[in-house]
């Protein structure tokens, strides 16, 4: 597939997602990094977003809860270029009914080449990166060329 460049803006659109057993871990991470996160636009699945907003007072664009389609909503935003970073603390020790949605969300984040953290250490690396508050170019699939090739 041919690639093109997308610029992640200095003010990032960050999706925050956590499975039930990981919500407290994400909450602690968000509270620790609140001064930095407040400079960006936050999205989250339903329960997680409401918990973050209630605990911190930050504005969070809450989707539906993950099992009700929230993971797919976040995935759609990623494919539309509206999410720049995904922080997703998923529980590797417990299966969830919407596992296919989880896999699809991670697949879309990979396809569209956005930074993804699935644990605290990686989330810390991303948010502490010297480029976190900078505009950054990434390579993404050239969908228009892909579509044109498919329609030949």
Swiss-Prot record:
Task: Please tell me, according to the UniProt entry, what happens when changing residue 91 to N.
Answer: Causes inhibition by substrate leading to loss of enzyme activity
Query: What mutagenesis or variant effect is reported for residue 20 to E?
Result: Strongly decreased catalytic efficiency
Cite the effect that the entry attributes to residue 101 to E/N: Strongly decreased catalytic efficiency
Q: Where in the cell is it found?
A: Cytoplasm
Give the annotated active site. 71
Listed under catalytic activity are:
dihydroxyacetone phosphate = methylglyoxal + phosphate
Q: Cross-referenced SMART domains, in alphabetical order?
A: MGS
Which parts of the sequence belong to the MGS-like domain?
Answer: 6-152
Report the pH profile. Optimum pH is 7.5.
Q: Which GO terms describe its biological process?
A: methylglyoxal biosynthetic process; protein hexamerization
Q: Which InterPro entries match?
A: Methylgl_synth, Methylglyoxal_synth_AS, MGS-like_dom, MGS-like_dom_sf
- Which residues hold substrate? 19, 23, 45-48, 65-66, 98
Q: Does the keyword Manganese apply?
A: no
PROSITE patterns found in the cross-reference section: METHYLGLYOXAL_SYNTH, MGS
Which protein family is it in? Belongs to the methylglyoxal synthase family.
Query: Assembly and interactions?
Result: Homohexamer.
Q: What does this protein do?
A: Catalyzes the formation of methylglyoxal from dihydroxyacetone phosphate.
Q: What protein name is recorded for this chain?
A: Methylglyoxal synthase
């Amino acid at each position: 597939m041919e690639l093109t460049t997308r610029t992640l803006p200095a003010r990032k659109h960050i999706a925050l997602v956590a499975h039930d057993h990981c919500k407290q871990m994400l909450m602690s991470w968000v509270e620790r990094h609140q001064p930095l996160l407040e400079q960006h636009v936050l999205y989250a699945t339903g329960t997680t977003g409401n918990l973050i907003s209630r605990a911190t007072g930050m504005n969070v664009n809450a989707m539906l809860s993950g099992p009700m389609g929230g993971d797919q909503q976040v995935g759609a935003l990623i494919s539309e270029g509206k999410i720049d970073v995904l922080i997703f603390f998923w529980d590797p020790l417990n299966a969830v009914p919407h596992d296919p949605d989880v896999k699809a969300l991670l697949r879309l984040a990979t396809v569209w080449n956005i930074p993804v953290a699935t644990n605290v250490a990686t989330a810390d690396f991303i948010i502490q990166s010297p480029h976190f508050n900078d505009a950054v170019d990434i390579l993404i699939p050239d969908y228009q060329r892909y579509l044109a090739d498919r329609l030949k």
